[in-house]
């Protein structure tokens, strides 16, 4: 996949692995972004199925600009590449954005993030995101008891479906990832949900 990381976030999670990036950044116009896409030879790769992931921070903080960028990108490319929007489930996406047939990579925060519940838990937004066809929910797990929070706050109220859930180990180093992965994988197997590692940390022992 190719990543476009947008600056800014609504939260400050204690385990965030990208803080250094979304606190800083550069301003690019559409032509400059297209120039980077062309120089990276991504147009052909998009046509062949490579994903284009728009992440943050919180991409929906720039929702009007994001919509404008995507509309112009589709016209320029003359194809509909697989585009993922990563978000933290605290900002409601507009109907215009939802109707663009994107993939939604949602990351609701649990209490282990140290983000106050009133900020991180937005049932109306979560239910709306769950209703989108290609939408899934990735939870960072630090201990087995975190599953109870998912069960009580997301599954029992029927905000999301079990098949939409992905569990990911909390880890900022390779050592942490290796230590926590078996516990999270076992939890995923037991609960019948998906497991995801953090390949960049496993390969390079770096957060970003």
Region locations from a protein language model:
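Conserved AdoMet/S-adenosylmethionine-binding subsite of the radical SAM
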Residues: 60-208
């Amino acid at each position: 996949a190719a990543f476009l990381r947008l600056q800014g976030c609504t939260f400050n999670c204690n385990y965030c692995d990208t803080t250094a990036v979304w606190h800083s950044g550069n301003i690019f116009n559409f032509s400059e972004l297209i120039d980077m896409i062309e120089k990276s030879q991504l147009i052909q790769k998009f046509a062949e199925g490579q994903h284009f992931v728009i992440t943050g921070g919180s991409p929906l903080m720039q929702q009007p600009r994001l919509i404008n960028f995507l509309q112009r990108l589709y016209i320029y490319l003359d194809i509909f590449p697989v585009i993922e929007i990563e978000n933290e489930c605290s900002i409601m996406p507009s109907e215009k954005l939802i109707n663009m047939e994107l993939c939604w990579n949602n990351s609701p925060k649990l209490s282990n993030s140290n983000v106050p519940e009133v900020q991180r838990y937005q049932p109306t937004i979560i239910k709306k995101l769950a209703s989108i066809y290609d939408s899934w929910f990735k939870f960072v797990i630090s201990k087995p008891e975190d599953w109870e929070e998912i069960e009580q706050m997301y599954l029992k109220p029927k905000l999301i479906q079990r098949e939409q859930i992905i569990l990911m180990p909390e880890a900022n180093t390779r050592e942490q990832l290796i230590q926590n992965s078996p516990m999270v994988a076992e939890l995923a197997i037991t609960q019948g949900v998906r497991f995801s590692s953090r390949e960049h940390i496993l390969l390079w022992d770096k957060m970003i």
